[in-house]
C-alpha cells in the first residue's frame, strides 16, 4: 500500500530529471510503499521517454503525468498531489539530489493522520569564489520553507488550498504555501536529517536581468499575506534602486533643461550609486574578467528592470507595493 507520494515538477530538462530520479530510486525506503509522480509542465516527449525507461522496471510505482499546457510549477505540483495515493506528500525539484535517507527521515517525522508540514535541510554547493548567481542561489540553504525539500500530509494541503497557480513562475509559490499553513495553524516542523542537495545550474551571461521578472510576484504575496510578508521576507536593495533611478532622472532633467550643474549632480549620483551596487554584487564573489564585466553591465540595467516588474506586479494585482 502506498503511504507516501513524491511529486516532482519538470519541463524539458531530461538530464537534470534523470539525476533526480536516480537519487529517488536509491531511497532507503520500501519501494512498494512510495510512488514517484513526475508532472511535466506541458507536453514533453523527452521527459516522457526518460520516465518510460524506468516505469515498471526500476520502480513499480512511478507515474508520468503531463499538463495539457504550460501553467507553471505551482500548477504542476497541484496536479501531482491531487492525483497522489499517499497520505503524505513529499516535494522536490528536478534539479535536486535527495539523500538516500531523505524520504525515510521525512516520513519518520510525519504523522499521516495529522495536519502537519515538514521542511528539510537543503545544501547548495558553491565554489570558493562563487558568481553572483551562485551566491543568490545559496540563499536557499537558509530559507524557512522551499519546495525543493518539503513534505506535508495530504489533508494539510487540502486545508491550506494547495499551491496558488497565480504564481506561474518558480518564485514565491512556496512562501505562499508556507504562509497558508501558518494562517491555518498547521505546524511546520524542521527535519535537519532530511537532506537534499541543490546544485547551482549553469546560467547564461546576464541571467540576473531575466531573473528580475520574478519580482512581480512579490506584490501578489504581499497582497495575500501583508503581515507575514513584512515579518519574514527580506527586501533586498529596493531603496538603492529607487535612488539610482531618481539620480538618473535628475541627470536627464538637467540635460534637457540645459542646467549643467543639475545634470552633473544627477550624473555623479547615478554613477556613484550604481558603482556601489556593482561593488556590493562583486563582494566575496568571483573576480574573473567575464564575471566583473557581467556585474558592471547588468548593474546599470537591473534597477530599472527590477522596479518596472515590481510596479507591474503592483498594478496587475492591484496592491500598493513599492
Regions found by a protein language model. Give the residues of each.
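Short aromatic/hydrophobic "clamp" motif used to bind/position activated sugar donors
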Residues: 89
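Glycine-rich, basic loop-to-helix element that forms the pyrophosphate-binding segment
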Residues: 67-84, 144-148
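Membrane-embedded multi-pass helical conduit in multi-pass membrane proteins
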Residues: 243-313, 317
Amino acid at each position: 500500500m502506498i503511504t507516501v507520494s513524491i511529486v516532482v515538477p519538470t519541463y524539458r530538462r531530461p538530464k537534470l530529471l534523470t539525476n533526480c530520479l536516480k537519487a529517488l530510486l536509491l531511497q532507503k525506503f520500501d519501494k512498494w510503499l512510495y510512488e514517484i509522480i513526475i508532472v511535466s509542465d506541458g507536453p514533453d516527449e523527452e521527459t516522457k521517454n526518460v520516465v518510460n525507461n524506468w516505469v515498471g522496471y526500476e520502480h513499480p510505482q512511478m507515474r508520468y503525468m503531463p499538463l495539457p499546457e504550460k501553467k507553471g510549477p505551482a500548477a504542476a505540483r497541484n496536479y501531482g498531489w491531487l492525483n497522489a495515493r499517499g497520505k503524505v506528500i513529499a516535494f522536490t525539484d528536478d534539479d535536486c539530489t535527495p539523500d538516500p535517507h531523505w524520504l525515510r527521515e521525512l516520513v519518520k517525522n510525519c504523522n499521516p493522520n495529522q495536519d502537519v508540514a515538514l521542511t528539510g535541510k537543503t545544501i547548495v554547493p558553491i565554489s570558493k569564489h562563487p558568481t553572483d548567481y551562485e551566491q543568490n542561489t545559496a540563499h536557499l540553504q537558509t530559507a524557512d520553507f522551499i519546495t525543493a525539500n518539503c513534505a506535508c500530509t495530504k489533508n494539510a494541503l487540502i486545508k491550506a488550498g494547495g499551491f496558488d497557480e497565480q504564481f506561474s513562475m518558480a518564485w514565491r509559490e512556496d512562501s505562499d504555501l508556507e504562509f497558508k499553513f501558518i494562517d491555518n495553524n498547521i505546524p511546520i516542523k524542521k527535519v535537519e536529517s532530511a537532506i537534499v542537495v541543490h546544485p547551482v545550474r549553469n546560467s547564461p551571461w546576464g541571467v540576473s536581468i531575466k531573473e528580475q521578472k520574478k519580482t512581480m510576484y512579490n506584490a501578489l504575496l504581499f497582497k495575500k499575506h501583508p503581515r507575514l510578508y513584512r515579518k519574514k521576507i527580506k527586501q533586498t536593495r529596493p531603496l538603492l534602486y529607487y535612488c539610482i533611478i531618481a539620480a538618473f532622472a535628475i541627470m536627464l532633467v538637467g540635460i534637457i533643461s540645459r542646467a549643467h550643474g543639475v545634470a552633473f549632480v544627477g550624473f555623479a549620483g547615478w554613477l556613484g550609486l550604481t558603482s556601489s551596487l556593482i561593488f556590493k554584487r562583486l563582494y566575496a564573489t568571483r573576480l574573473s574578467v567575464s564575471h566583473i564585466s557581467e556585474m558592471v553591465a547588468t548593474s546599470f540595467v537591473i534597477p530599472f528592470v527590477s522596479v518596472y516588474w515590481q510596479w507591474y506586479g503592483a498594478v496587475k494585482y492591484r496592491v500598493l507595493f513599492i
